[in-house]
Design a protein with these regions (language model features):
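Bacterial N-terminal signal peptides that target proteins for export
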Residues: 7-18
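Conserved active-site regions of diverse hydrolases
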Residues: 29-339
Length: 339
């Protein structure tokens, strides 16, 4: 099987991460050993937003559109099993293979519809060898920033998502991986102070940290509710929160609203430059871009996407998507869900 490829520019960061908690998980107690008969999926079903949004051939769309089939979260994880995840609209759902229902800017309500569409379709029966990958939360937070009731919105969204996931497990799903929001306070979008919100405000809608609690954040509420829904030792659902990994390469944030960015080339702290710059010309559209749509204005070049983090004001480059997916694969291996 193909080993996940880690870009060398992140090697020192990843070595450090290996000594820290690798994921914010539902408890892994009772999980299978990664060395004894690990789970090998024969079908991968993806739901969610741009992290899992692909074309009919399986190439990522909400990123720099390189035409590669492993440049999304779902695509990279599926490649571990030798599977290519393709858009289900142009590839009819079958008993084996890879299929994505994800759309570019999906919120939880859209993911609920995606799951409904899957469960009510021909071949929508869940099988033991199915791996289900859900990525959602970024667009939920973007909407909450513009809302007058963000706390209620986060509460309702996470409840509805857990209910939809329970429909999958009630139908027989035994391997469901959920990737929640990244820390949206560290995106170029957040730097524009949307709706006059500070970086601290936006972070507290995304995640919770010891220094800046976000007890009504999307990720914290989702973790709490999934833990309540799945109390048994051997759980069919794991929440793989990549906030720690993302925070390590997307900058250092503190409560006074100052953002410092880690420069990839030297891993040194710099101002809001370097990898923080989105590489797509139409970056405010938050829709990724084709190679012909890359910004080559200095300091950017036609190959900057190979070392930068952001494709646009929210979506990540293939490099960053692969990094997060590789960390998810590593964690999945520890409890026997990946070879």
């Amino acid at each position: 099987k193909r080993e996940p490829v880690m870009n060398p520019i992140f090697s020192r960061t990843l070595k450090a991460l290996c000594t820290v908690t690798v994921a914010t998980l539902l408890s892994a107690c009772g999980g299978a050993s990664s060395t004894v008969d690990p789970f090998v999926a024969t079908r991968v079903i993806a739901f969610g937003d741009g992290f899992n949004y692909v074309d009919g051939a399986g190439a990522g769309l909400s990123t720099v559109q390189t035409g590669e089939t492993d440049n999304t979260i779902a695509g990279r994880i599926a490649a571990r099993y030798g599977i290519v995840v393709k858009n289900v609209q142009t590839n009819a759902l079958a008993a084996t293979g890879g299929f994505s229902y994800a759309t570019a800017d999906a919120k939880v309500s859209n993911v609920v519809t995606q799951i409904d569409d899957f469960l009510t379709s021909a071949n929508g029966t869940v099988a033991k060898k199915d791996l289900i990958i859900i990525a959602v939360g970024n667009w939920e937070i973007k909407a909450a920033v513009a809302s007058t009731t963000p706390t209620a919105d986060m509460d309702a969204a996470t409840t509805n998502l857990v209910t939809a996931i329970q429909r999958l497990t009630a139908a027989g799903a035994e391997h469901v991986v959920v990737m929640p929001a990244i820390n949206m306070a560290r995106t170029p979008w957040a730097a524009t102070s949307p709706n006059s919100k500070s970086l601290a405000d936006i972070q507290q809608l995304s995640i919770t940290t010891s220094s800046l609690p976000g007890l009504n954040s999307f990720n914290f509420l989702l973790l709490t509710k999934l833990n309540a829904a799945y109390r048994q030792d051997k759980k069919p659902v794991y929440l793989l929160d990549r906030s720690s990994d993302f925070n390590n390469f997307a900058g250092k944030f503190d409560t006074n609203g100052t953002t410092r960015i880690i420069n990839v080339s030297g891993l040194a702290l710099t101002a809001d430059t370097g990898l923080y710059v989105p590489v797509c010309t139409a970056h405010t559209a938050m829709a990724g871009c084709a190679l012909g749509g890359l910004d080559t204005t200095s300091p950017l070049t036609a190959t900057s996407y190979q070392s930068y983090v952001f494709a646009d004001d929210m979506n990540l480059t293939p490099l960053a998507n692969r990094l997060l997916a590789d960390r998810m694969i590593y964690t999945m291996q520890t409890f026997g869900w990946a070879p």
